[in-house]
Curated annotation (Swiss-Prot):
Name this polypeptide is given: Sperm protamine P1
Pfam families listed in its UniProt record: Protamine_P1
Lineage start: Eukaryota, Metazoa, Chordata, Craniata, Vertebrata
Any GO MF annotation of the entry: DNA binding
PROSITE patterns for the chain: PROTAMINE_P1
GO cellular component: nucleosome; nucleus
InterPro entries: Protamine_P1
Tissue expr: Testis.
Keywords: Chromosome, Developmental protein, Differentiation, Disulfide bond, DNA condensation, DNA-binding, Nucleosome core, Nucleus, Spermatogenesis
Cysteine disulfide partners in this protein: C7-C15, C38-C46
Species this chain originates from: Equus asinus (Donkey)
Self-association and partners: Cross-linked by interchain disulfide bonds around the DNA-helix.
Length: 50
């Protein structure tokens, strides 16, 4: 839960945009675990940007 904190903070808007883009690009993996995939990539992107 702590890992997803970044997306729930003020970076949520940025995360949401990246999350949709990333998910659509990796559609094959996202289709099955759409939420997990999106959330995982979102967290990674957010953490690296910070």
């Amino acid at each position: 839960m702590a890992r997803y904190r970044c997306c729930r903070s003020q970076s949520q808007s940025r995360c949401r945009r990246r999350r949709r883009r990333r998910c659509r690009r990796r559609r094959r993996r996202c289709v099955r675990r759409r939420r997990v995939c999106c959330r995982r990539y979102t967290v990674l992107r957010c953490r690296r940007r910070r």
